């Protein structure tokens, strides 16, 4: 076997149709497009429905993507309480982005972090949890705080470093 004797099997490569090369080719003159009309002359525009108002124009405009949207990683005080109970946060710790990344509590490091206080409808902090938080003397260095979170942190004797 030599390189100059190699060839493809029958049907391995299909030849492209040569259109517009005379009547005898089978695809001459109108080139398989038929006679006259919009489709014989050029492509029909995308979304064109034959003169009927296109779907894209029939539907109302809806919404947009805000350029100024702020993406936050949400951290709840109950999550921090669980970390305290699991001995992952010690006395006097500064809770910031680096600590939360180290503990794998954040999805993305590029987003800002917002601290929320416990949602009264789902999980409520009991007196044991509150006393545990006050003993630890935690300091928070996060980007944003909910109003109730900031108020309760200061009330319990913990510190908000920024904002």
UniProtKB/Swiss-Prot annotation:
Protein name in the entry: Large ribosomal subunit protein uL15
GO CC terms in record: cytosolic large ribosomal subunit
UniProt xrefs under HAMAP family: Ribosomal_uL15 (MF_01341)
Function: Binds to the 23S rRNA.
InterPro entries: Ribosomal_uL15, Ribosomal_uL15/eL18_sf, Ribosomal_uL15_bac-type
Family: Belongs to the universal ribosomal protein uL15 family.
Entry annotated with the keyword Electron transport: no
Keywords assigned by UniProt, alphabetized: Ribonucleoprotein, Ribosomal protein, RNA-binding, rRNA-binding
Quaternary structure annotation from Swiss-Prot or TrEMBL: Part of the 50S ribosomal subunit.
Alphabetized GO MF terms: rRNA binding; structural constituent of ribosome
Gene name for this UniProt entry: rplO
GO biological process: translation
Top-level taxon: Bacteria
